[in-house]
Every structure is written in structure tokens, then in C-alpha cells.
A protein has these predicted regions:
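Conserved Rossmann-like nucleotide-cofactor binding loop
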Residues: 19, 48, 187
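Glycine/serine-rich loop-strand microenvironments at binding/catalytic pocket rims
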Residues: 1-14, 18, 129-136
Length: 316
């Protein structure tokens, strides 16, 4: 029997990304609509909500309109409307403008910092009395005697290298819940345990993965075009390697630039990071970044298999 402190909730959500926070918000909305008292807790491994969100993003607001209909009056970070789209095929020195696929039309959409958006969602969740706890990493899934999930435990903090308790040691806690929602994102360590234990991949197609590398740049004012969106395919990747790029113009002379490569590439010498560096030297990209400076960067694994590769989403 564990001697960890225990806290009881109706629902525990693991991961304070857009999906986890949206789920928590909707649960509290439904509980109020039905005059039910529902306790909801969200834990996040980052030191603050949004700390581990690295994606620049373009958001289509239909789902947000349904979740928070009055979001425009709540000081949301959705400020920069998309103004124009370019979809380019790159050769080593030139760019060819291609017809923009319908699913990539962004009229009426907004360019956002996904990190700022999740921070704002956390504020909306807390306004509905969701308990949001950043800085707590779920390290263990809790099961009852019937092998049903009953919550998660957070990891101990302050252990020394040899595993003993240091002067600032804090023991983890057990969060027990009637329902637990795992919103860890791609390759979450608890999600992998659940997929194996409950055979959640049994009837779906094999998942494929990519890596997304993103940087935030401050560029010269003359190179800044807030609301402008560029996507590319082609160089520096060869035709047998899946991938492409995005470049989003934010406000305050900021540009979010990223490069995605499928991890099923065949060339063992290919380095996604170095391909990204080559990409930034293309004339079409160089003219935007020249004279600027990189102020932030990150990378993230991505699910690329599509809806047919999603695992079963419910389990005991």
C-alpha cells in the first residue's frame, strides 16, 4: 500500500495542452448546465502551462466558437488574422507558386502562438473552477485490483543522483479519479503503457511519425508581414523523403518558422536539423530572416499516420 498523499477527483486530465484543457472546460460547462458538482484536475509537466508547447499555429475557430462562444470578449490571444497564403515548391535556388489546396486555405483563420493560447485556455478553465497544476509530471498509472485505471501518481522531486532523498525532497502524490483522460500528445510515456496493456492498436493501421523543428525569429520591420502564411515542399528534401515547412508572420516583427520531416526516411545520413538549416538558406526564406535573430527554438515528435492510425481511445 502506497504511503503517498492521496487526492480524489471525478476527472483527472494528464497534460495541459489544447485538447486536455478543452476537455476540462467542456466537462465543467456540462456539469454546471446539469447542476452537477464535478471536480476536475489538470496536471502539466511543464513549469508553467505552455512551457512545452513549441508549435506556431494557424487556428480555424469553429471549435473555439462552440467551446467558448464569447472568446472575443475574453482577451484571447487570437489577434492576427490570416491575410494571404502561399504554397511553394522549392528548387535549390528558385520557388514555384502552386495552387493552394482547399484544406490549406486560411481566410478567416488566425495566426497564434500555441503556447499563449494554452495559457489563455488554462485561465478559462480556472475561471470554471478547474484545478490546474503545472510542474507536476505524471509518472505512474494507478490500477485497482480489477486492472482498471483509477488515476495517476506524480513523481517524487528532489532526489539525489543515487536515488536518496535530498534536502529539498518532495514526495509525489496520488491523484485518484473516476475517469482519467490522457492528453500527453505524441509518444507520451503513459500512453505507450496503456496502448500495450489494453492492446489499443489492435485494429488500426500502423502509426507513422515525423519530427517538427520550430524556431521563433525577430526579423527586420521591413521583412515583417503580420498575417502572411507560407508553406513549402520540395528542396532541400529529395522526392523519396516526406516533409515540408511552414512560415507564419506574427505581430511585433516575429516570425514562426518550422520544418517537418517524416521519420521513415531511408537515408541513414540525413539529419533533420541540418536539413532545416539548409532550408533557411533558400533565397525565398533567407530574404525574410536576413538581419534578424533567433529568439526561441524547440522540436517535437508528430503523429503522421492519420485518423486510421489512431488507437482505440477508451479502456477500463
Amino acid at each position: 500500500m502506497s504511503d503517498k498523499e492521496k487526492m480524489e477527483y471525478d476527472v483527472v486530465v494528464v497534460g495541459a495542452g489544447p485538447s486536455g484543457l478543452s476537455a476540462a472546460i467542456r466537462l465543467k460547462q456540462l456539469s454546471k448546465e446539469n447542476n452537477k458538482d464535478l471536480s476536475v484536475c489538470v496536471i502539466e509537466k511543464g513549469s508553467e502551462v505552455g512551457a512545452h508547447i513549441v508549435s506556431g499555429a494557424v487556428i480555424e475557430t469553429k471549435a473555439l466558437d462552440e467551446l467558448i462562444p464569447d472568446w472575443k470578449t475574453k482577451n484571447s490571444p487570437l489577434k492576427i488574422k490570416a491575410t494571404d497564403d502561399k504554397f511553394l515548391y522549392l528548387t535549390e535556388t528558385k520557388s514555384i507558386k502552386l495552387p493552394t489546396p482547399p484544406q490549406m486555405h486560411n481566410k478567416g483563420n488566425y495566426i497564434i502562438s500555441l503556447s499563449d493560447f494554452t495559457k489563455w485556455l488554462a485561465e478559462q478553465a480556472e475561471a470554471l473552477e478547474v484545478e490546474v497544476y503545472p510542474g507536476f509530471s505524471a509518472s505512474e498509472i494507478l490500477f485497482n485490483e480489477q486492472d482498471k485505471v483509477i488515476g495517476v501518481a506524480t513523481c517524487d522531486m528532489g532526489r539525489l543522483k543515487d536515488g536518496t532523498e535530498g534536502p529539498n525532497f518532495e514526495q509525489g502524490i496520488e491523484l485518484h479519479a473516476t475517469q482519467t483522460i490522457f492528453s500527453e500528445g505524441c509518444r507520451g510515456h503513459l500512453g505507450k503503457i496503456l496502448m500495450e496493456k489494453f492492446d489499443l492498436n489492435k485494429d488500426n493501421s500502423p502509426q507513422t511519425y515525423g519530427i517538427g523543428i520550430k524556431e521563433l525569429w525577430e526579423v527586420s520591420p521591413e521583412n515583417s508581414k503580420p498575417g502572411s502564411i507560407v508553406h513549402t515542399t520540395g528542396w532541400p528534401l529529395k522526392t523519396d523523403t516526406y516533409g515540408g515547412s511552414f512560415l507564419y508572420h506574427l505581430d511585433n516583427n516575429k516570425v514562426s518558422i518550422g520544418f517537418v520531416i517524416g521519420l521513415d526516411y531511408k537515408n541513414p545520413y540525413l539529419s533533420p536539423y541540418l536539413e532545416f538549416q539548409r532550408f533557411k538558406h533558400h533565397p525565398e526564406i533567407k530574404k525574410i530572416l536576413e538581419g534578424g535573430r533567433r529568439i526561441n527554438y524547440g522540436a517535437r515528435a508528430l503523429n503522421e499516420g492519420g485518423i486510421q492510425s489512431l488507437p482505440k481511445l477508451t479502456f477500463p
